[in-house]
From Swiss-Prot:
Transmembrane segment boundaries: 36-56, 266-286, 295-315
Membrane topology: Multi-pass membrane protein
Name of the encoding gene: TMUB2
UniProt-recorded name of the protein: Transmembrane and ubiquitin-like domain-containing protein 2
Region (Disordered): 87-131, 145-170
Signal peptide, first to last residue: none
InterPro entries xref list: TMUB1/2, Ubiquitin-like_dom, Ubiquitin-like_domsf
Length: 321
């Protein structure tokens, strides 16, 4: 009896143990153990980290190379500018003539002095011939030109420049900056009693009808107004706008009458047709609602009434003013 009971217990335990063994034998990929999959995953993760580090390292080296190239380019430009500055200095300050030895004769002194003058004149001429070409190649416009010494060549005519420093105006005069749309400026000297029309005639002769002057966001339309009445003081900025030749500056009475040069509009205004079209659509929908009411549910009827009321208020608000 005991042996049979033990045998029955063993028979009842065997199916559970067999199921546990079957579950333990299940793998992610058939034919490949789970340990192999874990090792392969770890290797792939390490490779991904190494590749990410290498890519970051390469990007840093590339940026360093680019920074080095920019720095080297900046150094070369500084060297070129230094060379030009040296040439300009050589032109402005010619080399002094060597003093002859006191033991030499008077004839040798005269010859050496003549040769020294010729060499200095040749060097100054060579410097004057090289400088314009270098300025043309390097486009150096803001480089200050050094004046020659007292014994140099004949005086040159002064160049007129808008950006140069102007002399202080006489007492009673003010300086007004006329600024255009292309960010260029022109200095205008006027009296506070001068009018806007006089300012236009002085600095824009023949273009008074095309020029528009704007000060502090206000268009200066009245040519009889003085600068003092417009609170235009010294060093104020007036924006200038040049209109096309066909158009003129609108006067105070231009807004009362339509312009004669404005061409008539031949196109159809679509916005004005929206209200009639919507009225026709509402009329058609209401016609179908009255004659075929079986096709309209209660929510549809309520929505139609609401749209009609809203549209009526909108139309009365637009045309009832």
């Amino acid at each position: 009896m005991i042996s049979r009971h033990l045998q029955n217990n063993l028979m009842s335990v065997d199916p559970a143990s067999s199921q546990a063994m079957e579950l333990s034998d299940v793998t992610l990929i058939e034919g490949v153990g789970n340990e192999v999959m874990v090792v392969a995953g770890v290797v792939v993760l390490i490779l991904a980290l190494v590749l990410a580090w290498l890519s970051t390292y390469v990007a840093d080296s590339g940026s360093n190379q680019l920074l080095g190239a920019i720095v080297s380019a900046g150094d070369t430009s500084v060297l070129h500018l230094g060379h030009v500055d040296h040439l300009v200095a050589g032109q402005g300050n010619p080399e002094p003539t060597e003093l002859p030895h006191p033991s030499e004769g008077n004839d040798e002194k005269a010859e050496e002095a003549g040769e020294g003058r010729g060499d200095s004149t040749g060097e100054a001429g060579a410097g004057g011939g090289v400088e314009p070409s270098l300025e043309h190649l390097l486009d150096i416009q803001g480089l200050p030109k050094r004046q020659a010494g007292a014994g140099s060549s004949s005086p040159e005519a002064p160049l007129r420049s808008e950006d140069s420093t102007c002399l202080p105006p006489s007492p009673g005069l003010i300086t007004v900056r006329l600024k255009f749309l292309n960010d260029t400026e022109e200095l205008a000297v006027a009296r506070p009693e001068d009018t806007v029309g006089a300012l236009k005639s002085k600095y824009f002769p023949g273009q008074e009808s095309q020029m528009k002057l704007i000060y502090q966001g206000r268009l200066l339309q009245d040519p009889a107004r003085t600068l003092r009445s417009l609170n235009i003081t010294d060093n104020c900025v007036i924006h200038c706008h040049r209109s096309p030749p066909g158009s003129a500056v609108p006067g105070p009475s231009a807004s009362l009458a339509p312009s004669a040069t404005e061409p008539p509009s031949l196109g159809v205004n679509v916005g004005s047709l929206m209200v009639p079209v919507f009225v026709v659509l509402l009329g058609v929908v209401w016609y179908f609602r009255i004659n075929y009411r079986q096709f309209f549910t209660a929510p549809a009827t309520v929505s139609l009434v609401g749209v009609t009321v809203f549209f009526s208020f909108l139309v009365f608000g637009m045309y009832g003013r």
